[in-house]
Structures are given as structure tokens and as C-alpha cells.
UniProtKB/Swiss-Prot annotation:
It comes from Methanosarcina barkeri (strain Fusaro / DSM 804). The keyword Lyase does not apply. Pathway: Cofactor biosynthesis; coenzyme A biosynthesis. One of its GO terms (molecular function) is GTP binding. This is GTP-dependent dephospho-CoA kinase. GO terms for biological process: coenzyme A biosynthetic process. Keywords: Coenzyme A biosynthesis, GTP-binding, Kinase, Nucleotide-binding, Transferase. Catalyzes the GTP-dependent phosphorylation of the 3'-hydroxyl group of dephosphocoenzyme A to form coenzyme A (CoA). Pfam families: DUF359. Transmembrane segments: none annotated. Signal peptide: none annotated. It is an enzyme of class 2 (transferase).
Amino acid sequence: MSVHIELPRELRPLMKKPLGTLYRGKGRDTIEKFAGELGSPTKLISVGDVTTFHLLEVGIIPDICIVDNRTKRKPVSSDVSARNMDKVYSEVSVDNPAGIITDELIKTLCEAFASEKPIRIFVRGEEDLATLPVILLAPLDAVVLYGQPDEGVVFVKVTEEKKGEIRTLFEKLISKNQNYELDKLRRILDGHKNS
């Protein structure tokens, strides 16, 4: 049985607010604005096709990239799709519908974080909400990068404080009274290995 967390309509405006520092601009220029701040993160994760494409174009290889071959709900160009299939990556595919975070996505993210090899997670559906579990599951001092449509790239440094912010958001999504399966997802997202 598949379990999922759905983002209620009333919380969707929260997702339009950047979860970190927004670097305004387009393409390579935007990446160059924050490239010097990357340092040596414990893990570098990119969420989104266009962000991943521009990182790879400037020679920055994320440890984990999460893509769906779409941008703003339309197919990406063949150039973007081809570049994002860089041979350095092992690929895993998951189903994850729009507006939802599935248990399959969360389990795949856990496996990707445990891997020493670069992983490309191809999402059949939509990857937009993946940023939330990525921040919770990432090690401290990781960096998460994702696109903010028509504005630029959001740079999130994973800290205890940032994890706390995202945990608070998840508590709104998963009430304490929900079923055992959702409780298992909550424990995984809180960093517990027992599932």
C-alpha cells in the first residue's frame, strides 16, 4: 500500500516563499553568483531540471539531482534533458504525483543519501515538493539548490534551524492523529532509521 503526504491547498502559498537565499537571475549567471559560497558541502543536492542543467553546464556536479524533465509544467528542451542525463549518475525512477510526497520518494531519497555515488532521481509526476524531505533527510552542512520560477535559484544551507522550520511545516501536513503508516513516514523524516 502506498502512503503519501498531500500538500493542502491552503498551505500551497507557503511553497512560493523561498526556503533559503534567493539568487535572482537566469542561467549560468545565477549559478556564478553563489558558486563561491558552495565551499565543500557534506552533500550537494539539486531539485529541478533547469537548476541541475545550469550546475552541470558550469562543471558543478550535485551528489543527488532530482528531475522530472519538466519546467513550469511543460517539457524541458532536448538540450536540458540530454545534459541532465550525465553519465556520472546512477539513475533511479520514482512515481510522485503533483502536490504530493510519496513514501516511494522518501525511501528513494534515504537510499540516495546513503550512497557514495552520484544519483539522479527521475520523478514520474512532479518533483517540486521533493525539496521538503530533502532538507529533512540531508546531513548538516549540505546545500540544497532549487529553482524559483521566473526569479532565480534558492540556496539552502542545511542547519538544525532549517530542519526545524521544515519539521514545523511537516507537522502541519501530518497531524499527530493520523494512521500508523504516516507515523512511519514522520519517523523517517525525523531521522529515525526504524521504519
